[in-house]
């Protein structure tokens, strides 16, 4: 199912978000997310089935509720595709007005948003944000799909960049048809290696692994790493700008910044600076001893290297991954949207950047 999101006027948004403007102002001021409540009566259609239905969130160590937790974007086993109105308003406020570079030609982006298993609450807003980034800046046009039927070579051929929007698990697998699974996998690898772009958001780094073991080596290497553990939202970290000269980091002005989000760690053997060009990472030296102790000893990286975003070449293609964005409020930050914009333009082949591995 493909979704066409029409532009929502600012006046309409003001009416829809009545009573939430003060909350939004506070959220932007302190870096926290607005109310996690889903609007009663807010349209959830169009929807698509989600295998297995909703999965309850994990409890943080010691039990209790996760602060600021939003439920999955699933109602009665079907995936919500409509973002919340106050989130839309906040994103529109934060969007850049111009592309990082002028596109070399009209670009088309396919945003694949079907969840496998855990359907992150941020999926509808992430898809909307990518579409609006392209529309506002003229950098690309966007098609959003929630259908696995679109995951094939013929569909991919129509697009310059494929965005994997918070996919998790073995999202291409068909247990009833191994041959179909292999066709999907081959289509993805061939698409990227032939000179196209691949962009992965947050939970897309939590795919094709079981614990610390990769399940699809070619994919695991192409992506650059896979999830092992995370600090629960709202974990505070200082984001370090590893390559201040990169045009993908221009929105950060070379300055580190503090963010609150769910912070991924990547399995020791899956991520290496010998395989990717790191753009940003957690400044582990500025994390408190108490926060460091939250991570189980068995998942800690021996090198203390907790990268957040990176780029790499895969054949003739280009890959951009950003681990931030579990919480919707991350998409309210102009500097993060600049990073996403530049990352997509890099993947499309419009923005040149040093993508040699950070370590040799």
Model regions: which residues?
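Boundary at the C-terminal end of the N-terminal hydrophobic targeting segment
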Residues: 25-31
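Helical hinge/lid and interdomain linker segments adjacent to catalytic or ligand-binding clefts
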Residues: 70-81, 111, 121-208
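N-terminal secretory signal peptides that target proteins for export/translocation
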Residues: 1-8
């Amino acid at each position: 199912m493909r979704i066409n999101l029409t532009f929502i006027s600012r006046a309409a948004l003001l009416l829809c978000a009545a009573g939430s403007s003060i909350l939004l102002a506070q959220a932007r001021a302190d870096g926290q997310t607005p109310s996690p409540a889903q609007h009663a009566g807010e349209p959830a259609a169009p929807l698509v089935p989600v295998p297995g239905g909703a999965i309850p969130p994990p409890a943080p160590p010691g039990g209790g509720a996760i602060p600021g937790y939003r439920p999955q974007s699933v109602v009665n086993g079907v995936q919500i595709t409509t973002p919340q109105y106050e989130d839309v308003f906040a994103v529109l406020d934060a969007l850049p007005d111009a592309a990082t570079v002028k596109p070399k030609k009209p670009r088309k982006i396919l945003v694949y948003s079907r969840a496998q298993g855990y359907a992150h609450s941020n999926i509808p807003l992430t898809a909307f944000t990518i579409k609006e980034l392209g529309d506002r800046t003229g950098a690309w046009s966007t098609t959003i799909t929630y259908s696995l039927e679109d995951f094939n070579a013929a569909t991919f051929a129509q697009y310059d960049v494929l965005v994997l929007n918070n996919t998790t698990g073995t999202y291409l697998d068909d247990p009833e048809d191994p041959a179909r699974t292999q066709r999907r996998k081959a289509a993805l690898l061939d698409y990227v290696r032939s000179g196209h772009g691949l962009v992965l958001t947050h939970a897309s780094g939590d795919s094709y692994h079981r614990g610390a073991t990769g399940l699809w080596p070619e994919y695991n290497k192409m992506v650059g790493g896979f999830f092992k553990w995370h600090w629960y939202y709202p974990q505070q970290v200082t984001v370090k700008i590893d390559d201040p000269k990169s045009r993908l980091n221009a929105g950060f002005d070379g300055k580190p910044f503090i963010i609150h989000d769910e912070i991924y760690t990547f399995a020791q053997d899956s991520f290496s600076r010998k395989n990717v060009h790191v753009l940003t990472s957690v400044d582990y030296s500025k994390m408190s001893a108490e926060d460091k102790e939250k991570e189980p000893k068995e998942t800690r990286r021996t090198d203390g290297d907790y990268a957040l975003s990176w780029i790499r070449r895969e054949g003739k293609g280009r890959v951009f991954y950003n681990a931030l964005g579990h919480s919707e409020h991350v998409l309210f930050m102009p500097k993060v949207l600049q990073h996403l914009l530049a990352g997509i333009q890099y993947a499309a082949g419009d923005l040149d950047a040093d993508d040699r591995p950070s370590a040799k």
